[in-house]
């Protein structure tokens, strides 16, 4: 892992392009809709004044500087977990400080996933709507929004369809395309800004404060909801830390920020130059980004912005896979199938998540129909994620011995700033923001049910000392009157204690049908706070037939239990801890490892369980959700192994028994 980490930290032309293609898709496409959202929200071009434009530019500049540059690039990026970033990586760094920190992690993760469903719809629709300005398009289709919707649906459907095959090949063009995109943004901005350099006065925070109280600002304080769209990609920047490394972000962000600001300033210059152009008054969804292009450049502008939007969408889709995968490993989300279409680091494909994202994006496009309506709903959930990150970051700063006053200043300053954006975005709730809130609440509910159900079950399960059954297992092992069930009989246990397992496991071995084996394996898998841990410990209890294994795997490690267990068996045989398992019949010469049989216990809630009504509902809901998750066999990489599934009643809480009384006639 150290080699892998050092390789992504290297600064090369390739790493520079990869960073552009992976990290900045979301924030890099914000010029498509930020100015458009603010101008149209304030009443259109006819309501714009120079002071208003200076104030808007100042707000954008200082929002990007304070939130993206200072909070995320300079402070939060240092909170990496062995090179990995993101809200769940941050949570793993601090979760031992307080149990309640799981709440901001779950809330922030849910909101980030909800944002991932809106972003592809917003960016692709905003770019395709640029076609309306093309004379040739207008001549054929007029102002027909249905055509735009059809094109957007086709692009999004194609994007989700190709996920199954992996994006390694097309991913190679992401960096060069985004380089062209940012260069295009900068050049377009410079051309329009020339002759209007007085707009650079907007770098003073004076104008940002002044506009909030200006009568020219018809939105008042709520203008911050539109301004916030310029920095929504900051959280994604932190999440992608593990893909490109901190040094590459330090190198590329200043260049990206300059390109973005040049474009915003260029749009502002165009707006002021056209504010008396009555032909543009009343234009629905006026977009300065496309309007400021000369007619001969429009087609290229639409094409390159569409490609940038697709790349941004791909980054959000891949980020969603990674986010869910981390949540699963932390036991915050139901187990879903993970596929690896290529050998590239971070190339995960989750069919269930892909289908959900596709359906959600299509539904969002069909419901909102235009980027204007989507922008009105966009950004609300990501403010919640940023607030939750600030809470976790505060605890991380305390963990690394940052003086309490400094940590408090950081929390209060950025927390207040983000809370202001949250309040200003709250007006979006009735305009469509409720969609992202509902999505986030649905995801949060699933997380809550899953983790709460786990805690309820773990608190009530009956654990027993393995050594109490040492003699019985030895007798069963040597009982030649019984047919051998397996050479290696393997059970999965949730007990992290080296000498204990669940009673139901021993019940399966001894009571249900005595299972004779040479070696009984009890395997416990622990997901560590570090991303790429791969360690194990064993306890043989002084025997050669009874082994408790504890696998410690990082939260990004694929849990290939079959592969790991064979490696452990070979090492124990070589060390003399267990006997050589010679096979009389085999196609492999010198094979000294016997066969394996895995017993997977399927829990069914017993009618005898007597739980509090709320806990009972949680357990039933979790078992219902479990029906739609990937099977333990697939999750632990046992598809090609010999497995047997046993149904065991899950009896939780107190039980009530009715005693039958025999009646004699």
Curated annotation (Swiss-Prot):
| InterPro entries membership | K+_transporter, K_trans_C, K_trans_N, Kup
The chemistry this enzyme catalyses reads: K(+)(in) + H(+)(in) = K(+)(out) + H(+)(out)
Q: Please state the protein's primary subcellular location.
A: membrane
Q: Name one GO cellular component term.
A: plasma membrane
Q: Which GO terms describe its molecular function?
A: potassium ion transmembrane transporter activity; symporter activity
* TM annotation in the entry: 15-35, 48-68, 100-120, 147-167, 173-193, 219-239, 251-271, 292-312, 348-368, 378-398, 403-423, 431-451
Keyword rRNA-binding attributed: no
- Which is a Pfam family this sequence falls into? K_trans
Function, as annotated, reads:
Transport of potassium into the cell. Likely operates as a K(+):H(+) symporter.
Query: HAMAP family in the record, alphabetically?
Result: Kup (MF_01522)
What is the protein name for this chain? Probable potassium transport system protein Kup
């Amino acid at each position: 892992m150290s080699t892998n980490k050092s390789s992504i930290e290297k600064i090369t032309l390739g790493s520079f392009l990869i960073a552009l293609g992976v990290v900045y898709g979301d924030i890099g496409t914000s010029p498509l809709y930020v100015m458009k959202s603010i101008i149209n929200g304030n009443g259109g071009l006819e309501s714009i004044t120079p002071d208003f434009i200076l104030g808007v530019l100042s707000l954008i500049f200082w929002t990007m500087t304070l939130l993206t540059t200072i909070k995320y690039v300079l402070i939060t990026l240092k909170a990496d977990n062995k090179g990995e970033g993101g809200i769940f990586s941050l949570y793993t760094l601090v979760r031992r400080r307080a149990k309640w920190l799981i709440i901001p992690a779950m809330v922030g993760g849910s909101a980030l996933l909800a944002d991932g469903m809106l972003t592809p719809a917003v960016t692709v629709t905003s770019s395709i709507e640029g076609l309306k300005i093309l004379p040739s398009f207008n001549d054929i289709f007029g102002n027909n929004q249905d055509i735009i919707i059809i094109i957007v649906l086709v692009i999004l459907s194609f994007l989700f369809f190709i996920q199954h095959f992996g994006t390694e090949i097309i991913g190679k063009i992401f960096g060069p395309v985004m380089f062209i995109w940012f260069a295009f943004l900068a050049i377009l901005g410079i051309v329009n800004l020339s002759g209007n350099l007085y707009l650079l006065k907007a770098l003073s925070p004076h104008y940002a404060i002044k506009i909030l109280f200006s009568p020219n600002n018809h939105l008042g304080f709520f203008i911050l909801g539109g301004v916030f769209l310029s920095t929504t990609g900051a959280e994604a920047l932190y999440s992608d830390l593990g893909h490109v490394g901190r040094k590459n972000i330090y190198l590329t962000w200043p260049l990206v920020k300059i390109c973005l600001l040049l474009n915003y300033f260029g749009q502002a210059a165009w707006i002021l130059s056209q504010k008396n152009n009555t032909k543009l008054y009343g234009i629905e969804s006026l977009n300065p980004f496309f309007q400021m292009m000369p007619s001969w450049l429009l087609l290229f502008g639409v094409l390159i912005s569409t490609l940038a939007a697709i790349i941004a969408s791909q980054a959000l889709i891949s980020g969603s896979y990674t986010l869910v995968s981390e949540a699963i490993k932390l036991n915050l989300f139901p187990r879903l199938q993970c596929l690896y279409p290529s050998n590239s680091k971070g190339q995960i494909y989750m069919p269930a998540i892909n289908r959900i994202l596709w359906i959600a994006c299509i539904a969002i496009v069909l419901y909102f129909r235009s980027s204007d309506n989507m922008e009105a709903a966009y950004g609300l959930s990501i403010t919640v994620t940023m607030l939750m990150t600030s809470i976790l970051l505060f605890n991380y700063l305390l963990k690394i011995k940052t003086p309490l006053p400094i940590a408090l200043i950081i929390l209060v300053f950025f927390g207040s700033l983000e809370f202001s954006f949250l309040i200003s975005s709250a007006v979006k709730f009735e305009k469509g923001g409720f969609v992202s809130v509902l999505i986030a609440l649905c995801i949060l509910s699933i997380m809550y049910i899953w983790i709460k159900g786990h805690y309820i079950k773990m608190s009530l399960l009956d654990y027993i000392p393995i050594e109490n059954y040492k003699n019985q297992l030895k007798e069963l092992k040597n009982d030649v009157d019984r047919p051998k069930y397996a050479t290696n009989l393997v059970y999965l246990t949730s007990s992290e204690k080296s000498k204990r397992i669940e009673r139901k496991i021993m019940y399966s071995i001894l009571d249900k049908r005595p299972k004779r084996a040479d070696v009984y394996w009890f395997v416990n898998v622990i997901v560590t706070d570090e991303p790429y841990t791969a360690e194990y410990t064993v306890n043989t209890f002084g025997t050669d037939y009874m082994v408790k294994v504890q696998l410690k795997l990082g939260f990004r490690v694929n849990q290939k239990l079959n592969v790991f267990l064979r490696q452990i068996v070979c090492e124990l045989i070589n060390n003399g801890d267990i006997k050589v398992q010679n096979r009389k019949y085999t196609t492999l010469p010198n094979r000294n490892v016997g066969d394996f049989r895995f017993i997977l216990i399927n829990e069914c809630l017993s009618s005898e369980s007597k739980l509090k009504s709320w806990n009972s509902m949680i357990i039933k809901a979790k078992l219902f959700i479990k029906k739609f998750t990937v099977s333990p066999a697939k999750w632990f990489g046992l598809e090609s192994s010999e497995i047997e599934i046993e149904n065991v009643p899950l009896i939780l809480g107190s039980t009530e028994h009715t005693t039958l009384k025999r009646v004699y006639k």
